[in-house]
Amino acid sequence: MVALSMKLPFALATAFTAIPLVFGGSLSDVKHVVYFMQENRAFDHYFGTMSGVRGFKDPNVHVDEKGTPVWYQPTTNSEAEYLLPFYLGANPAYKNGSQCAVGGSNDWTENHNAWNYGKINGWITNNSQYAWGHYDRSDIPTHFAVAEEWSVADMYAEFVIGPTAPNRASWISGTLNFDSQVGAPEEIGGPYMENWSTHECEYTDGVPFNCYPLKWMTMPELLEAQNISWFVYRDSDSTNDDPMYYFQNYLDSPSDGPLAVKGLSYEGFPLFIEQASNGTLPEVSWIIGSFPLSEHPPHTPTSGAWMIEKTIEVITQGPLANDTVLFISYDETGGWGDHVPPFVSPNGTAYEWALNPLTQKEYWPVGPGFRVPFFAVSPWTRGGSVFSEPSDHSSQLLFLEEWAAAQGKDVKLDAIAPWRRSHMSNLVNMFDFEHPRFDIPTLANVSFPAWSDGAYIATTICQEENKGYTQPPIPYGNQTLQDALWAEEGYKHLRGALTEGRYVVFSQKWKQGTYAIGKYKSSDNIHSLSTASNFSGERYRFIVYQVGDAFSKEFYIQSVFGEYLTHSGRFASTKAKADIFSINYTASKGYTIKSPAGQYLGTSPYGGITWTDQKSYFDVVSVTYNDE
């Protein structure tokens, strides 16, 4: 392992940034794609308190058959019937030590039991009492800054409801071979659902599973066949996180063969820094960082933040800044809880549901699983937008297929199952190729992680300096819903197909100012209302309800005051009396709202709304304010 002691000032004035004279305005402008996957954090665990995302202020929160919101997780503790989300650093004595706190289990069984057939009521009873713990901005300022300066996805999920290895295998191959999708397990490997690295199969009642190594096709092999340059930047202590090591073709590759040289070398993060700085990165890169910097509990978010900042720094300040996309993701939740039900396929969908390999009894979905943090850093994702399309690790592969096609190359990973291919986002809508921004923001400027005798020691220091104060007391019986679901106030602009889970403002810009559709509390009519600069007014705040599943583009639109929109321009008291509207997204333009009569809704700067045959595009803003 090599210490990365270099530290450059992150901020760089726009005046010193290279700005091209002509914007290409398409996916073909991307010449370099960098994939960087960290470890074991859930979306709510990191971003539940962030404004403008599907977090603790979710107006469409899942409820059980009794009407109890998912926030109320049942417990077996005598002090409290339920546990609400809680801030890990609430007690000042535990504030620093909570950086190296540990959550629950990331295993297949525990996380499926937390899912509990869609009830999402087993995080505490079936996983860990710490599963409902979370951080806020003060603990992870870099992560908040990346989300707010570039783009964060709040509907991005782990590929499988399970641990690290299968999620990372899916990250480069798009399958885990459930239902023998790509071949018989004893011949080709899988179904891969646990952190298993013994060169044999496991069996339950004679049925094989976790057959290892894996022998199906991976994305780097397809890139190699198309003469697309690629490399895996893997540090020496990260073998278990490098999915290339799970696959037989890489293990069998001659030491001087492309799969071994590019996929299994120990040319880690220092080489990435060098090549990003001098402009010699391959077209596609994978970063597998040092394990102590991976954010895998108890390794600290702060240590991982340094590596995130350094990666962004060398890309955005290097010669490839204007044509590079960096995706930062997390493999799985690490046993930290998330409140959004996984958007799994219909029961019985081919390759997506299976008998639990460990018991051959329960019939469970493979995934997609619970939400994890996901960012896109590029000139086309600047500005702090929220990407709302359902996505998972296969989405990164689907993006690469689209990107390769834009470069004139034919890359298609056939192992991606039909349902995933047709339902998971390819991430292209995350980008606004017509309006790139080449200015570079300032991040938190995290210090280099503590290092001694050839090893990172920040985790050890955290544990020793805060001995007895890393796992805060669980606040059983000492919570209020208002405190538990506290979130920052503010707003973010949405991109991508609209989904539930946010208070939204439908706004349009006119030369007279910004106007939004709205409703006065005392009126039954829709109006066009001038908005505040922070979109804080209740009168133009709405909740949308998808008709169908998380992939539907049909919605009921409800005023924050409770009534539902109709095509007549009036509001109805119930859904039964309301109309269903089609809401569609077009990249670089925005959202259209189409009535059942086929007309498009629009605003005007004169107080009235319009219904016309011409598309009228809205900017949809996700807002979080504590008057909700």
Question: Whereabouts are the PLM-identified features?
Answer:
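Fungal secretory targeting signals
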Residues: 1-24
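N-terminal pro-sequences and low-complexity stem/linker regions of secreted or lumenal proteins
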Residues: 22-513, 518-598, 602-628
